[in-house]
């Protein structure tokens, strides 16, 4: 016959085993959630540093129009590059100090010419960047159309962006002007867009004009409801 002390000891052991069993059961049930949190933590460490106090310029346009080249030219240094969490794309951020003014320039994943509801996750990330970060948009046309998209398609993309984000000023850049001889086809689009700038990002032509425009961009004051 066991004495009371031994019985109580075995009872405590049994209760602890029951508790451990319940805890293990709960952990198993939420294991997928815990694994996802570990994954998210690892990815968020690679997120580029975004300065929400700086004037933010978001570069937009189809792939291969010269966005990365332009970012390098304006920032004057290698931009910060990191994978955007939960996507296979990367975003690049360049930082510029001009006349005691901090400017950050963000190169987003390429936007495609179709309704927002049809966009994939990568494209929606670019939309979020435009909506919540941009104080101005640098929209780049490939005047040579060597990017694989005609000027009409690029113009339609611009109109889509302007319609969705009608409170954000847009600066129109026509890139790769060094590759075309007859500019009459380009000028029919330029005539519809005030303050367009002809540039060659790879040659560095027109960068001074862009910098002057960026100096005039004012930060948009957003309330909490707009930001979240």
What are these regions (language model features)?
Residues 1-14:
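Single conserved hydrophobic/aromatic residue that forms the stacking wall/gate
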Residues 23-47:
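N-terminal pre-Walker A segment at the start of P-loop NTPase domains
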Residues 46-54:
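Phosphate-binding P-loop
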Residues 55-77, 89:
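Glycine-rich phosphate-binding P-loop
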Residues 75-104, 112-125, 151:
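Switch I (effector-binding) loop of TRAFAC-class P-loop GTPase G-domains
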Residues 124-195:
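Conserved C-terminal guanine-recognition region of P-loop GTPase G domains, centered on the G4
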Residues 178-228:
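Canonical P-loop GTPase G-domain recognition
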């Amino acid at each position: 016959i066991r004495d009371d002390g031994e019985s109580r000891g075995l009872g405590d052991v049994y209760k602890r085993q029951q508790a451990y069993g319940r805890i293990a059961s709960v952990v198993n049930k939420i294991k997928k959630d815990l694994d996802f949190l570990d994954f998210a933590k690892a990815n968020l460490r690679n997120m580029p540093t975004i300065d929400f106090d700086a004037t933010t310029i978001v570069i937009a346009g189809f792939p291969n129009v010269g966005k990365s080249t332009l970012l390098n030219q304006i920032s004057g240094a290698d931009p910060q590059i990191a994978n955007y969490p939960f996507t296979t794309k990367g975003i690049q951020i360049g930082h510029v100090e001009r006349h005691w003014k901090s400017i950050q320039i963000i190169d987003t994943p390429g936007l495609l010419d179709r309704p927002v509801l049809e966009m994939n996750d990568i494209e929606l990330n670019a939309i979020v960047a435009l909506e919540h970060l941009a104080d101005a948009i640098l929209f780049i046309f490939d005047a040579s159309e060597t990017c694989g998209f005609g000027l009409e398609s690029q113009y339609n993309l611009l109109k889509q962006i302007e319609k969705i984000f009608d409170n954000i000023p847009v600066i129109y850049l026509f890139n790769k002007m060094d590759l075309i001889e007859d500019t009459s086809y380009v000028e029919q689009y330029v005539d519809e867009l005030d303050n367009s700038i002809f540039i060659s990002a790879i040659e560095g032509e027109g960068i001074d004009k862009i910098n002057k425009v960026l100096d005039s961009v004012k930060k948009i004051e957003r309330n909490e409801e707009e930001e979240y």
